[in-house]
Protein backbone atom coordinates (compact mmCIF):
# COMPACT_ATOMS: atom_id res chain seq x y z
CA UNK A 1 0.00 0.00 0.00
CA UNK A 2 2.72 2.46 0.97
CA UNK A 3 4.61 2.04 -2.30
CA UNK A 4 1.41 2.60 -4.30
CA UNK A 5 0.67 5.74 -2.29
CA UNK A 6 4.23 7.01 -2.69
CA UNK A 7 4.27 6.42 -6.44
CA UNK A 8 0.91 8.10 -6.87
CA UNK A 9 2.08 11.03 -4.77
CA UNK A 10 5.21 11.39 -6.88
CA UNK A 11 3.19 11.48 -10.09
CA UNK A 12 0.87 14.16 -8.71
CA UNK A 13 3.77 16.46 -7.93
CA UNK A 14 4.97 17.93 -4.64
CA UNK A 15 1.90 19.89 -3.55
CA UNK A 16 -0.87 17.43 -4.41
CA UNK A 17 1.43 14.52 -3.55
CA UNK A 18 1.91 15.81 -0.04
CA UNK A 19 -1.85 15.96 0.41
CA UNK A 20 -2.14 12.31 -0.61
CA UNK A 21 0.71 11.27 1.68
CA UNK A 22 -0.83 13.30 4.48
CA UNK A 23 -4.06 11.36 4.10
CA UNK A 24 -2.14 8.07 4.19
CA UNK A 25 -0.32 9.08 7.36
CA UNK A 26 -3.48 9.70 9.33
CA UNK A 27 -3.47 5.97 10.15
CA UNK A 28 0.06 6.23 11.59
CA UNK A 29 0.05 6.29 15.41
CA UNK A 30 1.21 9.48 17.09
CA UNK A 31 4.74 8.89 18.37
CA UNK A 32 6.28 9.63 21.73
CA UNK A 33 8.96 12.11 20.69
CA UNK A 34 11.07 11.14 23.73
CA UNK A 35 10.83 7.33 23.82
CA UNK A 36 12.40 5.72 26.86
CA UNK A 37 15.68 3.93 26.21
CA UNK A 38 15.33 0.48 27.75
CA UNK A 39 18.57 -1.20 26.65
CA UNK A 40 22.04 0.30 26.38
CA UNK A 41 24.34 -2.60 27.26
CA UNK A 42 25.94 -5.47 25.36
CA UNK A 43 23.75 -8.49 24.55
CA UNK A 44 25.58 -11.82 24.89
CA UNK A 45 24.07 -15.25 25.54
CA UNK A 46 20.59 -13.71 25.95
CA UNK A 47 21.89 -11.58 28.84
CA UNK A 48 22.80 -7.91 29.23
CA UNK A 49 26.37 -7.00 30.19
CA UNK A 50 28.49 -3.94 30.72
CA UNK A 51 31.60 -3.75 28.56
CA UNK A 52 34.57 -5.63 29.99
CA UNK A 53 36.40 -2.29 30.03
CA UNK A 54 33.39 -0.58 31.67
CA UNK A 55 33.65 2.08 28.95
CA UNK A 56 30.60 3.83 27.50
CA UNK A 57 30.01 6.29 24.68
CA UNK A 58 27.26 8.84 24.02
CA UNK A 59 24.62 8.44 21.34
CA UNK A 60 23.30 11.79 20.14
CA UNK A 61 19.99 13.14 18.87
CA UNK A 62 20.99 14.63 15.49
CA UNK A 63 18.04 17.03 15.53
CA UNK A 64 19.46 18.84 18.55
CA UNK A 65 22.99 17.63 19.15
CA UNK A 66 21.97 16.59 22.67
CA UNK A 67 23.08 13.30 24.21
CA UNK A 68 20.25 10.74 24.40
CA UNK A 69 22.10 8.33 26.69
CA UNK A 70 25.40 6.53 27.14
CA UNK A 71 25.88 3.05 25.69
CA UNK A 72 28.30 0.27 26.62
CA UNK A 73 31.38 0.41 24.39
CA UNK A 74 32.26 -3.09 23.27
CA UNK A 75 35.75 -3.91 22.04
CA UNK A 76 37.94 -6.98 21.44
CA UNK A 77 37.34 -8.50 24.88
CA UNK A 78 33.58 -8.30 24.39
CA UNK A 79 33.82 -9.73 20.88
CA UNK A 80 35.79 -12.66 22.29
CA UNK A 81 33.03 -13.33 24.84
CA UNK A 82 30.33 -13.07 22.18
CA UNK A 83 32.15 -15.40 19.77
CA UNK A 84 32.64 -17.94 22.56
CA UNK A 85 28.90 -17.84 23.33
CA UNK A 86 28.01 -18.15 19.64
CA UNK A 87 30.40 -21.07 19.15
CA UNK A 88 28.86 -22.89 22.11
CA UNK A 89 25.38 -22.35 20.67
CA UNK A 90 26.57 -23.86 17.38
CA UNK A 91 28.04 -27.06 18.82
CA UNK A 92 26.72 -30.37 17.52
CA UNK A 93 23.82 -31.52 19.63
CA UNK A 94 22.97 -28.01 20.86
CA UNK A 95 19.31 -26.95 20.97
CA UNK A 96 19.91 -24.67 17.96
CA UNK A 97 21.65 -27.32 15.84
CA UNK A 98 18.98 -29.92 16.64
CA UNK A 99 16.08 -27.54 16.02
CA UNK A 100 13.84 -28.37 13.05
CA UNK A 101 14.19 -25.98 10.13
CA UNK A 102 10.46 -25.28 10.31
CA UNK A 103 10.91 -24.22 13.94
CA UNK A 104 13.63 -21.75 12.92
CA UNK A 105 11.10 -20.29 10.53
CA UNK A 106 8.52 -20.09 13.30
CA UNK A 107 10.97 -18.19 15.52
CA UNK A 108 11.70 -15.69 12.74
CA UNK A 109 7.97 -15.16 12.25
CA UNK A 110 7.59 -14.72 16.00
CA UNK A 111 10.35 -12.10 15.96
CA UNK A 112 8.54 -10.26 13.16
CA UNK A 113 5.31 -10.38 15.18
CA UNK A 114 7.05 -8.84 18.20
CA UNK A 115 8.60 -6.09 16.09
CA UNK A 116 5.16 -5.37 14.64
CA UNK A 117 3.72 -5.24 18.16
CA UNK A 118 6.31 -2.61 19.12
CA UNK A 119 6.37 -0.87 15.75
CA UNK A 120 5.38 2.58 17.02
CA UNK A 121 8.04 2.55 19.73
CA UNK A 122 10.76 1.28 17.38
CA UNK A 123 9.93 3.85 14.71
CA UNK A 124 10.10 6.66 17.27
CA UNK A 125 13.38 5.38 18.70
CA UNK A 126 14.84 5.10 15.19
CA UNK A 127 13.86 8.69 14.44
CA UNK A 128 15.27 9.95 17.74
CA UNK A 129 18.63 8.24 17.25
CA UNK A 130 19.00 8.51 13.46
CA UNK A 131 17.06 11.65 12.51
CA UNK A 132 14.99 10.22 9.65
CA UNK A 133 11.34 11.36 9.50
CA UNK A 134 9.13 9.31 11.80
CA UNK A 135 6.61 8.72 9.04
CA UNK A 136 9.39 7.09 6.97
CA UNK A 137 10.60 5.04 9.93
CA UNK A 138 7.09 3.74 10.54
CA UNK A 139 5.76 3.28 7.01
CA UNK A 140 8.91 2.40 5.06
CA UNK A 141 11.69 1.03 7.26
CA UNK A 142 9.55 -1.02 9.65
CA UNK A 143 7.39 -2.29 6.80
CA UNK A 144 10.47 -3.58 4.97
CA UNK A 145 11.88 -5.09 8.18
CA UNK A 146 8.74 -7.15 8.70
CA UNK A 147 8.62 -8.30 5.09
CA UNK A 148 12.28 -9.29 5.12
CA UNK A 149 12.04 -11.39 8.29
CA UNK A 150 8.84 -13.08 7.17
CA UNK A 151 10.28 -13.77 3.73
CA UNK A 152 13.28 -15.57 5.20
CA UNK A 153 11.11 -17.36 7.75
CA UNK A 154 9.42 -18.98 4.76
CA UNK A 155 12.77 -20.13 3.36
CA UNK A 156 13.92 -21.89 6.54
CA UNK A 157 12.62 -25.35 5.55
CA UNK A 158 12.78 -24.89 1.78
CA UNK A 159 16.46 -24.21 1.07
CA UNK A 160 17.98 -27.67 0.89
CA UNK A 161 20.19 -30.02 -1.08
CA UNK A 162 19.56 -32.44 -3.94
CA UNK A 163 20.08 -36.08 -4.81
CA UNK A 164 22.55 -36.57 -7.66
CA UNK A 165 22.50 -39.53 -10.12
CA UNK A 166 26.24 -40.22 -10.37
CA UNK A 167 27.54 -43.31 -12.22
CA UNK A 168 27.96 -46.62 -10.42
CA UNK A 169 26.42 -48.18 -7.33
CA UNK A 170 26.41 -45.01 -5.28
CA UNK A 171 23.88 -42.75 -3.65
CA UNK A 172 25.03 -39.13 -3.78
CA UNK A 173 23.37 -36.08 -2.32
CA UNK A 174 24.15 -32.56 -1.15
CA UNK A 175 23.47 -30.82 2.14
CA UNK A 176 23.16 -27.06 2.64
CA UNK A 177 24.88 -26.61 5.98
CA UNK A 178 25.19 -23.37 7.98
CA UNK A 179 28.57 -21.63 7.73
CA UNK A 180 28.82 -21.24 11.51
CA UNK A 181 29.67 -18.12 13.49
CA UNK A 182 28.77 -15.10 11.35
CA UNK A 183 30.13 -11.67 12.16
CA UNK A 184 27.76 -8.97 10.95
CA UNK A 185 28.57 -5.26 10.92
CA UNK A 186 25.67 -2.94 10.15
CA UNK A 187 25.57 0.78 9.25
CA UNK A 188 23.77 3.79 10.69
CA UNK A 189 21.62 4.89 7.72
CA UNK A 190 19.02 2.09 8.00
CA UNK A 191 19.75 0.48 11.39
CA UNK A 192 16.65 -1.67 11.76
CA UNK A 193 16.44 -2.63 8.11
CA UNK A 194 20.10 -3.58 7.79
CA UNK A 195 19.78 -5.67 10.94
CA UNK A 196 16.89 -7.56 9.35
CA UNK A 197 18.74 -7.97 6.03
CA UNK A 198 21.61 -9.63 7.91
CA UNK A 199 19.72 -11.66 10.51
CA UNK A 200 17.04 -13.06 8.19
CA UNK A 201 19.16 -15.28 5.92
CA UNK A 202 21.70 -16.12 8.63
CA UNK A 203 19.11 -17.46 11.08
CA UNK A 204 16.93 -19.11 8.45
CA UNK A 205 19.89 -21.28 7.44
CA UNK A 206 20.87 -22.15 11.02
CA UNK A 207 23.87 -19.91 11.66
CA UNK A 208 24.78 -18.05 14.84
CA UNK A 209 25.53 -14.33 14.86
CA UNK A 210 27.84 -11.79 16.47
CA UNK A 211 26.58 -8.39 15.31
CA UNK A 212 28.29 -5.04 15.73
CA UNK A 213 25.90 -2.11 15.48
CA UNK A 214 26.91 1.39 14.41
CA UNK A 215 28.03 3.68 17.21
CA UNK A 216 25.87 6.50 15.81
CA UNK A 217 22.62 4.51 16.01
CA UNK A 218 22.79 1.58 18.45
CA UNK A 219 19.45 1.88 20.23
CA UNK A 220 16.92 0.12 17.99
CA UNK A 221 19.19 -2.86 17.28
CA UNK A 222 19.66 -3.35 21.02
CA UNK A 223 15.91 -3.28 21.58
CA UNK A 224 15.45 -5.91 18.87
CA UNK A 225 18.05 -8.04 20.65
CA UNK A 226 15.71 -8.27 23.61
CA UNK A 227 12.87 -9.24 21.27
CA UNK A 228 15.07 -12.04 19.94
CA UNK A 229 15.25 -13.41 23.47
CA UNK A 230 11.50 -12.94 23.94
CA UNK A 231 10.82 -14.77 20.67
CA UNK A 232 12.54 -17.86 22.05
CA UNK A 233 15.89 -18.03 20.25
CA UNK A 234 18.34 -20.08 22.35
CA UNK A 235 21.12 -18.29 24.24
CA UNK A 236 24.17 -17.45 22.14
CA UNK A 237 22.41 -17.65 18.77
CA UNK A 238 22.36 -13.86 18.40
CA UNK A 239 24.78 -11.54 20.20
CA UNK A 240 24.75 -7.76 19.70
CA UNK A 241 27.66 -5.45 20.48
CA UNK A 242 27.59 -1.64 20.26
CA UNK A 243 31.04 -0.28 19.58
CA UNK A 244 33.45 1.32 17.15
CA UNK A 245 34.84 0.01 13.90
CA UNK A 246 38.58 0.15 14.67
CA UNK A 247 38.05 -1.87 17.87
CA UNK A 248 34.93 -4.06 17.88
CA UNK A 249 34.54 -4.20 14.10
CA UNK A 250 38.19 -5.00 13.53
CA UNK A 251 38.07 -7.71 16.21
CA UNK A 252 35.21 -9.44 14.37
CA UNK A 253 36.88 -9.20 10.96
CA UNK A 254 40.17 -10.66 12.22
CA UNK A 255 38.79 -13.22 14.68
CA UNK A 256 40.08 -16.74 14.08
CA UNK A 257 36.85 -18.34 15.29
CA UNK A 258 34.47 -16.29 13.12
CA UNK A 259 33.60 -18.21 9.96
CA UNK A 260 32.06 -15.40 7.91
CA UNK A 261 31.75 -11.63 8.03
CA UNK A 262 29.06 -9.52 6.35
CA UNK A 263 29.56 -5.76 6.24
CA UNK A 264 27.53 -2.83 4.95
CA UNK A 265 29.32 0.52 4.92
CA UNK A 266 32.02 2.50 3.17
CA UNK A 267 34.33 1.11 0.52
CA UNK A 268 37.32 2.29 2.55
CA UNK A 269 36.33 0.13 5.53
CA UNK A 270 35.33 -2.72 3.21
CA UNK A 271 38.94 -2.88 2.03
CA UNK A 272 40.13 -3.21 5.63
CA UNK A 273 37.64 -5.98 6.38
CA UNK A 274 38.59 -7.94 3.27
CA UNK A 275 42.27 -7.74 4.24
CA UNK A 276 41.62 -8.69 7.88
CA UNK A 277 39.50 -11.66 6.82
CA UNK A 278 42.21 -12.87 4.47
CA UNK A 279 45.04 -12.43 6.94
CA UNK A 280 43.22 -14.32 9.69
CA UNK A 281 41.36 -17.52 8.80
CA UNK A 282 40.34 -16.66 5.23
CA UNK A 283 36.76 -16.26 6.42
CA UNK A 284 34.02 -15.79 3.86
CA UNK A 285 33.15 -12.15 3.16
CA UNK A 286 30.05 -10.36 1.91
CA UNK A 287 30.43 -6.62 1.30
CA UNK A 288 27.78 -4.04 0.41
CA UNK A 289 29.73 -0.82 -0.01
CA UNK A 290 29.56 2.65 -1.50
CA UNK A 291 28.08 3.90 -4.72
CA UNK A 292 27.91 6.81 -7.15
CA UNK A 293 24.89 5.63 -9.06
CA UNK A 294 24.00 7.12 -12.47
CA UNK A 295 20.38 8.13 -13.06
CA UNK A 296 19.90 8.62 -16.82
CA UNK A 297 17.05 10.81 -18.05
CA UNK A 298 16.44 10.39 -21.79
CA UNK A 299 14.77 13.18 -23.75
CA UNK A 300 11.60 11.12 -24.28
CA UNK A 301 11.05 10.51 -20.55
CA UNK A 302 7.87 11.60 -18.78
CA UNK A 303 9.20 14.91 -17.46
CA UNK A 304 6.98 15.23 -14.38
CA UNK A 305 7.69 11.67 -13.30
CA UNK A 306 11.43 11.86 -14.03
CA UNK A 307 11.87 15.08 -12.05
CA UNK A 308 10.05 13.74 -9.01
CA UNK A 309 11.78 10.35 -9.13
CA UNK A 310 15.23 11.93 -9.60
CA UNK A 311 14.50 14.13 -6.58
CA UNK A 312 13.46 11.06 -4.57
CA UNK A 313 16.47 9.07 -5.83
CA UNK A 314 18.89 11.60 -4.38
CA UNK A 315 17.20 13.20 -1.39
CA UNK A 316 15.49 10.18 0.20
CA UNK A 317 16.82 9.47 3.71
CA UNK A 318 18.64 12.83 3.73
CA UNK A 319 20.75 11.58 0.81
CA UNK A 320 22.21 8.92 3.09
CA UNK A 321 21.70 5.95 0.75
CA UNK A 322 24.48 3.83 -0.72
CA UNK A 323 22.43 3.50 -3.92
CA UNK A 324 21.37 7.16 -4.16
CA UNK A 325 20.99 8.45 -7.73
CA UNK A 326 23.87 10.84 -7.21
CA UNK A 327 24.86 11.42 -10.83
CA UNK A 328 21.79 12.67 -12.67
CA UNK A 329 22.57 12.53 -16.40
CA UNK A 330 20.05 14.52 -18.48
CA UNK A 331 19.91 14.56 -22.29
CA UNK A 332 20.82 17.99 -23.60
CA UNK A 333 17.55 18.92 -25.34
CA UNK A 334 15.58 18.68 -22.07
CA UNK A 335 18.43 19.70 -19.75
CA UNK A 336 17.36 23.31 -19.11
CA UNK A 337 13.76 22.42 -18.31
CA UNK A 338 14.77 19.48 -16.14
CA UNK A 339 17.20 21.61 -14.13
CA UNK A 340 14.64 24.37 -13.64
CA UNK A 341 12.02 21.92 -12.38
CA UNK A 342 14.51 20.07 -10.17
CA UNK A 343 15.58 23.29 -8.49
CA UNK A 344 11.95 24.25 -7.86
CA UNK A 345 11.28 20.82 -6.35
CA UNK A 346 14.35 21.03 -4.10
CA UNK A 347 13.32 24.48 -2.88
CA UNK A 348 9.89 23.12 -1.95
CA UNK A 349 11.34 20.24 0.09
CA UNK A 350 10.30 20.49 3.74
CA UNK A 351 13.24 20.25 6.14
CA UNK A 352 12.66 20.20 9.88
CA UNK A 353 11.56 18.28 12.94
CA UNK A 354 11.55 14.61 11.91
CA UNK A 355 8.58 13.91 14.18
CA UNK A 356 6.42 16.38 12.23
CA UNK A 357 4.36 14.49 9.64
CA UNK A 358 4.89 17.30 7.11
CA UNK A 359 8.68 16.92 7.19
CA UNK A 360 10.36 15.33 4.18
CA UNK A 361 13.96 15.69 5.36
CA UNK A 362 15.50 15.45 8.81
CA UNK A 363 19.09 16.06 9.92
CA UNK A 364 22.24 14.25 8.84
CA UNK A 365 23.11 11.51 11.28
CA UNK A 366 25.87 13.32 13.19
CA UNK A 367 28.25 16.26 13.20
CA UNK A 368 30.93 14.36 11.28
CA UNK A 369 28.57 13.69 8.37
CA UNK A 370 27.21 17.24 8.56
CA UNK A 371 30.69 18.73 8.15
CA UNK A 372 31.65 16.21 5.48
CA UNK A 373 28.66 17.09 3.30
CA UNK A 374 29.27 20.84 3.69
CA UNK A 375 32.88 20.17 2.66
CA UNK A 376 31.72 18.53 -0.56
CA UNK A 377 29.43 21.49 -1.27
CA UNK A 378 32.39 23.83 -0.85
CA UNK A 379 34.42 21.63 -3.21
CA UNK A 380 31.68 21.79 -5.85
CA UNK A 381 31.66 25.57 -5.79
CA UNK A 382 35.45 25.80 -5.88
CA UNK A 383 35.72 23.41 -8.85
CA UNK A 384 33.26 25.37 -10.98
CA UNK A 385 29.92 23.62 -10.60
CA UNK A 386 26.96 26.01 -10.60
CA UNK A 387 25.20 26.14 -7.23
CA UNK A 388 21.51 26.52 -8.08
CA UNK A 389 19.96 26.27 -4.63
CA UNK A 390 20.82 25.39 -1.05
CA UNK A 391 24.44 25.04 -0.11
CA UNK A 392 24.42 25.59 3.63
CA UNK A 393 23.06 24.64 7.02
CA UNK A 394 19.27 24.65 7.29
CA UNK A 395 19.02 25.38 11.03
CA UNK A 396 20.96 26.94 13.89
CA UNK A 397 20.74 23.74 15.92
CA UNK A 398 21.16 20.13 14.89
CA UNK A 399 22.71 18.77 11.72
CA UNK A 400 20.26 19.98 9.07
CA UNK A 401 21.47 20.81 5.54
CA UNK A 402 19.55 22.67 2.86
CA UNK A 403 18.49 20.61 -0.17
CA UNK A 404 21.24 21.48 -2.62
CA UNK A 405 21.37 21.28 -6.42
CA UNK A 406 24.42 21.75 -8.63
CA UNK A 407 24.21 22.24 -12.40
CA UNK A 408 26.93 22.29 -15.05
CA UNK A 409 28.69 19.44 -13.26
CA UNK A 410 31.62 17.85 -15.10
CA UNK A 411 32.76 14.23 -14.76
CA UNK A 412 36.15 15.14 -13.30
CA UNK A 413 34.78 17.18 -10.40
CA UNK A 414 35.06 15.75 -6.91
CA UNK A 415 31.29 15.91 -6.38
CA UNK A 416 30.79 13.84 -9.55
CA UNK A 417 33.26 11.14 -8.49
CA UNK A 418 32.99 10.69 -4.74
CA UNK A 419 30.11 9.49 -2.60
CA UNK A 420 28.73 12.54 -0.77
CA UNK A 421 26.07 10.77 1.29
CA UNK A 422 23.99 13.88 1.74
CA UNK A 423 21.24 16.03 0.18
CA UNK A 424 23.37 17.29 -2.71
CA UNK A 425 22.12 16.71 -6.27
CA UNK A 426 24.53 16.84 -9.21
CA UNK A 427 23.06 17.26 -12.70
CA UNK A 428 25.19 16.47 -15.76
CA UNK A 429 24.39 16.98 -19.46
CA UNK A 430 24.85 14.36 -22.20
CA UNK A 431 24.13 14.12 -25.94
CA UNK A 432 23.88 10.49 -27.04
CA UNK A 433 23.03 7.15 -25.46
CA UNK A 434 26.45 5.74 -26.37
CA UNK A 435 28.15 8.71 -24.71
CA UNK A 436 26.24 8.39 -21.46
CA UNK A 437 26.95 4.66 -21.17
CA UNK A 438 30.68 5.32 -21.24
CA UNK A 439 30.44 8.16 -18.74
CA UNK A 440 28.08 6.30 -16.43
CA UNK A 441 30.38 3.27 -16.33
CA UNK A 442 33.50 5.41 -15.82
CA UNK A 443 33.33 5.03 -12.05
CA UNK A 444 34.98 2.80 -9.48
CA UNK A 445 31.50 2.04 -8.16
CA UNK A 446 28.75 -0.17 -9.59
CA UNK A 447 25.97 -0.51 -7.05
CA UNK A 448 22.87 0.76 -8.87
CA UNK A 449 21.65 2.74 -11.88
CA UNK A 450 18.40 3.94 -13.38
CA UNK A 451 17.00 4.82 -16.79
CA UNK A 452 13.98 6.98 -17.59
CA UNK A 453 12.62 6.58 -21.12
CA UNK A 454 9.46 5.61 -22.99
CA UNK A 455 11.48 3.66 -25.56
CA UNK A 456 11.70 -0.05 -24.74
CA UNK A 457 14.73 -0.56 -26.98
CA UNK A 458 16.65 2.18 -25.16
CA UNK A 459 15.62 0.76 -21.79
CA UNK A 460 16.80 -2.73 -22.73
CA UNK A 461 20.07 -1.52 -24.21
CA UNK A 462 20.95 0.65 -21.23
CA UNK A 463 19.93 -1.90 -18.61
CA UNK A 464 22.30 -4.40 -20.24
CA UNK A 465 25.14 -1.92 -20.80
CA UNK A 466 25.29 -0.34 -17.35
CA UNK A 467 27.76 -1.90 -14.91
CA UNK A 468 25.61 -2.07 -11.80
CA UNK A 469 24.11 -4.72 -9.56
CA UNK A 470 20.63 -3.19 -9.84
CA UNK A 471 19.12 -1.20 -12.71
CA UNK A 472 15.75 0.48 -12.29
CA UNK A 473 13.74 1.47 -15.36
CA UNK A 474 11.27 4.36 -14.96
CA UNK A 475 11.48 4.05 -11.17
CA UNK A 476 14.02 4.32 -8.36
CA UNK A 477 14.72 2.67 -5.00
CA UNK A 478 12.19 -0.10 -5.55
CA UNK A 479 13.18 -2.94 -3.23
CA UNK A 480 11.64 -6.27 -2.33
CA UNK A 481 12.86 -8.98 0.01
CA UNK A 482 12.55 -11.34 -2.97
CA UNK A 483 15.03 -9.47 -5.23
CA UNK A 484 18.81 -9.61 -4.66
CA UNK A 485 20.86 -6.48 -4.04
CA UNK A 486 24.60 -5.95 -4.30
CA UNK A 487 27.31 -4.27 -6.31
CA UNK A 488 29.85 -4.53 -9.08
CA UNK A 489 33.44 -3.27 -8.76
CA UNK A 490 34.23 -1.38 -5.53
CA UNK A 491 30.58 -1.42 -4.50
CA UNK A 492 31.09 -4.83 -2.95
CA UNK A 493 30.84 -8.57 -3.39
CA UNK A 494 28.05 -11.05 -2.89
CA UNK A 495 24.31 -10.44 -2.77
CA UNK A 496 21.78 -9.83 -0.04
CA UNK A 497 18.03 -10.49 -0.20
CA UNK A 498 16.16 -13.04 -2.26
CA UNK A 499 17.16 -16.67 -2.65
CA UNK A 500 20.61 -15.44 -3.66
CA UNK A 501 21.05 -13.99 -0.17
CA UNK A 502 20.95 -17.48 1.34
CA UNK A 503 23.99 -18.69 -0.59
CA UNK A 504 26.45 -16.63 1.45
CA UNK A 505 25.28 -18.31 4.66
CA UNK A 506 25.56 -21.96 3.62
CA UNK A 507 28.26 -24.48 2.77
CA UNK A 508 27.37 -27.11 0.17
CA UNK A 509 28.50 -30.57 1.26
CA UNK A 510 28.50 -33.59 -1.05
CA UNK A 511 27.82 -36.97 0.58
CA UNK A 512 28.38 -40.12 -1.51
CA UNK A 513 27.40 -43.56 -0.15
CA UNK A 514 28.31 -46.92 -1.69
CA UNK A 515 25.20 -49.10 -2.00
CA UNK A 516 24.83 -52.82 -2.89
CA UNK A 517 22.77 -52.02 -5.96
CA UNK A 518 21.53 -48.80 -7.48
CA UNK A 519 18.21 -48.74 -9.28
CA UNK A 520 16.57 -45.92 -11.21
UniProtKB/Swiss-Prot annotation:
Record key words, sorted: Acetylation, Mitochondrion, NAD, Oxidoreductase, Transit peptide, Ubl conjugation
UniProt: NAD(+) binding residues: 186-188, 212-215, 245, 265-270, 288, 419-421
GO molecular function: aldehyde dehydrogenase (NAD+) activity; carboxylesterase activity; NAD binding; phenylacetaldehyde dehydrogenase (NAD+) activity
Organism this protein belongs to: Bos taurus (Bovine)
Name under which the protein is recorded: Aldehyde dehydrogenase, mitochondrial
EC number(s) on file: 1.2.1.3
Entry-linked Gene3D superfamilies: Aldehyde Dehydrogenase, Chain A, domain 1, Aldehyde Dehydrogenase, Chain A, domain 2
Pathway given in the UniProt record: Alcohol metabolism; ethanol degradation; acetate from ethanol: step 2/2
Record site: Transition state stabilizer: 189
Extent of motif SIFI-degron: 13-27
GO cellular component, one term: mitochondrial matrix
Top EC class for this record: oxidoreductase
Catalytic reactions on record: an aldehyde + NAD(+) + H2O = a carboxylate + NADH + 2 H(+)
Catalytic residues identified in the record: 288 (proton acceptor), 322 (nucleophile)
N6-acetyllysine modification, residue list: 55, 76, 162, 371, 378, 386, 429, 431, 444, 454
Its job: Required for clearance of cellular formaldehyde, a cytotoxic and carcinogenic metabolite that induces DNA damage.
InterPro entries in the record: Ald_DH/histidinol_DH (IPR016161), Ald_DH_C (IPR016163), Ald_DH_CS_CYS (IPR016160), Ald_DH_CS_GLU (IPR029510), Ald_DH_N (IPR016162), Aldehyde_DH_dom (IPR015590)
PROSITE patterns membership: ALDEHYDE_DEHYDR_CYS, ALDEHYDE_DEHYDR_GLU
Family to which this protein belongs: Belongs to the aldehyde dehydrogenase family.
One biological process term in Gene Ontology: aldehyde catabolic process
Amino acid sequence: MLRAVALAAARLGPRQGRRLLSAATQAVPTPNQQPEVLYNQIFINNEWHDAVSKKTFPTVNPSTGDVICHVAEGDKADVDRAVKAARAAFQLGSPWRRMDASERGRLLNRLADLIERDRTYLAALETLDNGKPYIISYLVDLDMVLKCLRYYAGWADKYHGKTIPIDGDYFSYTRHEPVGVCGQIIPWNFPLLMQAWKLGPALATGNVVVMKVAEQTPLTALYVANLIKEAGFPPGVVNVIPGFGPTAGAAIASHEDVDKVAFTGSTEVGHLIQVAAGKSNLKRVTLELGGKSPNIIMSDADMDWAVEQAHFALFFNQGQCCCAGSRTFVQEDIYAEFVERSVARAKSRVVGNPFDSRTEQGPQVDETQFKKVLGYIKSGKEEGAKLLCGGGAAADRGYFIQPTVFGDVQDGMTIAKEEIFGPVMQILKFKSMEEVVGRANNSKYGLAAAVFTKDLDKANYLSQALQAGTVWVNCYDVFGAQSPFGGYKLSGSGRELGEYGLQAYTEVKTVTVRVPQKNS
